Amino acid sequence: MSTEGSAVDTLTIEEAAAELERLAKEIAHHDALYHGKDQPEISDADYDALKRRNDALEARFPELIREDSPSRHVGAAPSVTFSPVVHARPMLSLDNTFSQEDVQDFVAGVYRFLGRLPDQSIAFTAEPKIDGLSMSIRYENGRLVTAATRGDGTTGENVTANIRTIAEIPNELPKGVPAVVEIRGEVYMAKSDFLALNRQMEAEGKQTYVNPRNTAAGSLRQLDAKVTASRKLKFFAYAWGEMAEMPADTQFGMVQTFKDWGFPVNPLMKRLNSVADILAHYDEIGLERPDLDYDIDGVVYKVDSLELQQRLGFRSRSPRWATAHKFPAEQAFTEVEKIEIQVGRTGALTPVARLKPITVGGVVVTNATLHNEDYIKGIGNSGERIRPEEHDIREGDTVIVQRAGDVIPQILDVVMEKRAADARSYEFPKTCPVCGSHAVREVNEKTGKTDSVRRCTGGFICRAQATEHLKHFVSRNAFDIEGLGSKQVDFFFENEDPSLQIRTAPEIFTLEKRQQDSLTKLENIDGFGKVSVGKLYAAINERRSIALHRFIYALGIRHVGETTAKLLARSYGTYEAFATAMKEAAPLSGEAWTDLNAIEGIGEVVARAMVEFYKEPRNVEVIGRLLDEVTPAEAEQPVTAGSPVAGKTVVFTGSLEKFTRDEAKARAESLGAKVAGSVSKKTDIVVAGPGAGSKLDKARELGVQTMDEDEWLALISG
């Protein structure tokens, strides 16, 4: 059962460990999208909520802090497209504050750490938090030599050639500057330039950009510096990395020095002493925000004295002497013109509000997700009422729209005073709008709870599900067919030419053969070419033999993710054994059903979803055709005979020096061990490298066997 919405103080240690594992993976996923690809899929507010949940769990269960915890890392791994640059000093993130009370606590914490009374003797700087791309620019002997993105905080991407195209960034500094100077700041795109660029894109019939921040980041990562130069990027300097000598002894003085050296600095930066003045400046900047020609998402406060900054020091990923006071999400009023239903890969019917275009935070909003049937009625996922009963969302309603975290729009409430007298409640469809199949809300037999999502039962016969299923089938953790991405799948799916059409997975593997006898050659179609088509065929043929767990995952069975697919592959060994077991488990009773539920990590909900999938004749028919083209390899079984760690639960902690964590995990699993992320009474062995902390302490407290890497290697090699 998910503990996602449960209060932290009600969780058991096992539940907390499981949720910390989920949060680590989820936050890492969103970090990669935001910092690495500039394509966030959740709002800043939702992301901050995930981080706060993680921090709260770690505060209550410090012994469960993971090596891959979000509290220990910044940003995401740098892209392989640009050469890596190791920062001379790490580029850390800032802790966030969200209320006046949080700011008061931050200031009080500074005084408390320094052993002082809060007598307003400590000055702070306050400046807008620019919503752009963090940058570190290195000068040696006054000349610009390197510019790098934040990356993961330790290693960034070398974008020197592109940075040189930004007119506001000097290529040379005045005489007399220190021998080594690293200027840090934010690259951004002005709102006016962003709107002009989108007008140009519209005039050329091209897709417009979403917001200035993503556009600036994408522009800076262009392989052709001429493209970057055409985007009119700008820069604000506000910090520094390595400095051969310090030209000032305060934060404010350093930034003023940057201005003297020719860098643009933010004119709204102030030096203040009291919490009241700090909060007043926050309000002033908030009032000016709509009129600024650049996006900001908060105000940054820093202790002004560099000596005090040094005494205050750092936490694992952020300084104690600074915090970012975030703005609440921006809101606006608009009209719901229509409610439409989208159908996803698993058949979920998701309502989307088509809105009368409205600008919120510099971005034109035309759509908002309505999540599910209950959300339209004002009911949350746990059955709680989130709006008054009469505030259901109807077509024609005037609504309050919020860009939470300035990314994803959502409807907060209905303005009842403007509701038309003849406005009718929205009737959620009971059939799929794409294929006409029944759409049902499943009931959990154990809990009796009705799923908040209504799903199409059409499976592969539903065009919407079929398209999304194909995209899942070729995705990175499934068949991973290079050259067959989302756009290509849409092209082949919608094509009416029999030699080009791909509507089920088996047709991917017959494409080349069908093309041989066709007059319509793929290589002659816009967007393709002889070389790219050849590479596509080669990539497809490479996947005619595939690992069993990838094959199972690619089938797109509901609830069967990558980890579950690996468990199934290891348990059954061959696809034939797996498919036979699913067929024999169909009555939801008997030996096959019992064995399926006995697999660790497979609960009744997952087991039932798999059995139901194989009950559908259409699914079995498609898989049969797929097996004519593809051979799932027999799963490699752990070598447990004579293995000293077979059946044991192992935890790796600290900095491993002789192998990577993935290598250590793979080796342990190949010997029949289970690798866990946290220490508990069920743990058998803890392998501790340098820097091992709370997990090692917990192991000793519980009497769990501990060893270093050499002892571990001796154990598994003996």
Curated annotation (Swiss-Prot):
Keywords: DNA damage, DNA repair, DNA replication, Ligase, Magnesium, Manganese, Metal-binding, NAD, Zinc
tRNA processing listed as a keyword: no
Catalytic activity: NAD(+) + (deoxyribonucleotide)n-3'-hydroxyl + 5'-phospho-(deoxyribonucleotide)m = (deoxyribonucleotide)n+m + AMP + beta-nicotinamide D-nucleotide
Binding site for Zn(2+): 432, 435, 456, 462
Keyword Zinc applies: yes
Domain BRCT: 640-718
Enzyme class per UniProt: ligase
Active site: residue positions: 129
Pfam families: BRCT, DNA_ligase_aden, DNA_ligase_OB, DNA_ligase_ZBD, HHH_2
Gene Ontology BP, a term: DNA repair
Enzyme Commission identifier(s): 6.5.1.2
Gene3D superfamilies in the record: 5' to 3' exonuclease, C-terminal subdomain, 6.20.10.30, BRCT domain, DNA ligase/mRNA capping enzyme, Helix hairpin bin, Nucleic acid-binding proteins
PROSITE patterns: BRCT, DNA_LIGASE_N1, DNA_LIGASE_N2
Record-linked NCBIfam families: dnlj (TIGR00575), PRK07956.1 (NF005932)
Family affiliation: Belongs to the NAD-dependent DNA ligase family. LigA subfamily.
HAMAP family, per the entry: DNA_ligase_A
Functional summary from the UniProt entry: DNA ligase that catalyzes the formation of phosphodiester linkages between 5'-phosphoryl and 3'-hydroxyl groups in double-stranded DNA using NAD as a coenzyme and as the energy source for the reaction. It is essential for DNA replication and repair of damaged DNA.
Name under which the protein is recorded: DNA ligase
Organism name: Rhizobium etli (strain CIAT 652)
Upper classification of the organism: Bacteria, Pseudomonadati, Pseudomonadota, Alphaproteobacteria, Hyphomicrobiales
